[in-house]
């Protein structure tokens, strides 16, 4: 997911699915959402994100890893729910 957006290889449909998954993540776990926003969209490193959020780098790395996996699962579930065009 992360690589695709930065390379411009993500489809419009996937961007919509990602946006919906991010909204769900924000409601579910705001800290993970913030880690994703800083790492992915702001381009901060683990260390920079940790400093910005007053967390340890290990915590940020764990939250980042979990959030990416969760987002991919959510997007896949949403993709399966969509009717075929």
Question: How would you label these PLM feature ranges?
Answer:
Residues 76-85:
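Short, basic, alpha-helical segments at the C-terminal edge of helix-turn-helix-like DNA-binding modules
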Residues 53-77:
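DNA-recognition helix of helix-turn-helix
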Residues 5-37, 44:
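Amphipathic alpha-helical segment used for protein-protein interaction
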Residues 1, 38-39:
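Short acidic/histidine-centered micro-motifs embedded in hydrophobic/aromatic stretches
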Residues 34, 42-62:
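Helix-turn-helix DNA-binding module
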